[in-house]
Regions:
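Beta-strand-rich recognition/accessory modules
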Residues: 212, 216-297
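Beta-strand-rich N-terminal accessory domains
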Residues: 23-95, 112, 190-219, 223-226
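Extended acidic/polar, glycine-enriched regions
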Residues: 271, 276-284, 291, 324-326, ...
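Bacterial N-terminal signal peptides
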Residues: 9-18
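Contiguous beta-strand segments within globular domains
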Residues: 300-328
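Extended, loop-rich substrate-binding clefts of extracytoplasmic carbohydrate-active enzymes
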Residues: 73-144
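Acidic (Asp/Glu-rich), glycine- and aromatic
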Residues: 136-185
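Bacterial N-terminal signal peptides that target proteins for export
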Residues: 1-9
């Protein structure tokens, strides 16, 4: 989610660049996200948590590593589980503070993707702040978590599984690999639908809860049988073997747990989670996130052509997207590829275009 430069050239080329220098600490940009060279951290900039998009999001060297850092009501939520409603988002000097709440009554048992919201009323703030090379996440609640939801309400961060299969992780002194196939033992928990809230006046047409729940496995419920955590501890490192994807998370407020969300959802991700303790409000969650920063990393130029084609009389122009600090002014080549060989048919000097 970085601002980009563009070059513009006839038929196949354009470049763009800037002499912008990066600080060695995370800084809040004018676009509303944190940046430290090739690492970007977003916070509540987009809202689609059921699609693994929203909350605190970590992008490292062009790849989205983790996302959906937020309060959730299940250890491994899927696309049918309750999501919070975002009330506000404010930018500070070097911080982002979002205010959210449960329930979102407009989604309770209604709509194309009905969700079952429990009888839990909660307003909370998530403050995300740059602390040098670290990102500090602090969650404050407006009230303690009710006893019946202790162990269910927690802060989660989801890791994209596709790039982690067979790769290592470390939790305190324990190490392991992210498995390609979920293999954790199972455990049972009390499902939240046993404490369903009443958020409608009886005039709306609501989904049939009995049909949603069913008699066997139901992804609408999905919190009665879940995976046991692969590990518990206070400090977790994903991909310690790879400087381009290594990220360390330390919890100052309670244990971290690593879950496999694919056990009860076919589109689940790996989930790092901290449960919220009984009786706490201020500082209910405090995480220190430390992504590894590779000095002077830049992404490779990306050639963009028209997605709808070109008119026969139109100049065929393309855009070469460059990373912000990439100020190279190289010649672009147009290459014809056939069954026999490749041949350079033209050399183009790109023109600056865009930011």
């Amino acid at each position: 989610m970085r601002k980009k430069h563009f070059l513009f050239a006839s038929v196949l080329a354009l470049l763009c660049g800037s002499s912008t220098l990066y600080a060695q600490d995370f800084k809040l940009t004018s676009s509303g996200y944190f940046k430290n060279q090739g690492v970007d951290v977003m916070a509540f900039d987009d809202i689609y948590p059921e699609g693994h998009q929203g909350g605190v999001c970590i992008i490292m060297n062009g790849h989205r590593v983790a996302t959906n850092g937020d309060i959730r009501l299940e250890a491994t939520p899927g696309q049918w589980q309750p999501v919070p409603k975002q009330l506000d988002r404010k930018l500070g000097d070097n911080s982002i503070t979002a205010t959210l709440c449960y329930p979102d009554s407009s989604r309770h048992l209604t709509g194309f993707n009905p969700m079952i919201y429990p009888d839990l009323h909660l307003i909370y703030t998530v403050n995300v702040e740059s602390k040098g090379k670290n990102i500090e996440v602090t969650v404050d609640l407006d009230r303690p978590i009710p006893q019946e939801f202790i162990g269910k309400v927690g802060f989660t961060l989801e890791f994209f599984p596709g790039s982690l299969f067979g790769k290592p992780w470390i939790m305190d002194g324990q190490s392991g690999i992210f498995p390609q196939q979920p293999n954790s033992p199972l455990m049972t928990t009390q499902p939240n639908y046993l404490h369903t809230g009443n958020y409608h006046d009886g005039k709306q047409s609501l989904a049939d809860m009995d049909k949603l729940i069913g008699k066997g496995y139901s992804p609408i419920v999905a919190d009665d049988i879940i995976s046991e955590p692969y590990a518990k501890g206070r400090k977790f490192t994903s991909r310690p073997d790879d400087p381009y994807n290594k990220v360390t998370i330390e919890s100052l407020s309670g244990d971290l747990q690593l879950f496999d969300g694919r056990m009860n959802h076919n589109n689940g991700w790996f989930v790092l989670r901290s449960n919220i303790k009984p009786g706490v409000t201020k500082g209910a969650v405090k995480w220190i996130i430390t992504p590894n920063v590779v000095a002077d990393w830049m992404y490779q130029p990306v050639i963009q052509t028209s997605q709808i084609g070109y008119h026969p009389a139109q100049d065929k122009e393309a855009v070469i997207e460059m990373d912000i600090p990439d100020n190279r002014k190289e010649t672009a080549q147009i290459i014809r590829i056939d069954a026999h060989a490749e041949k350079v048919v033209n050399n183009v000097t790109p023109a600056n275009w865009g930011k």
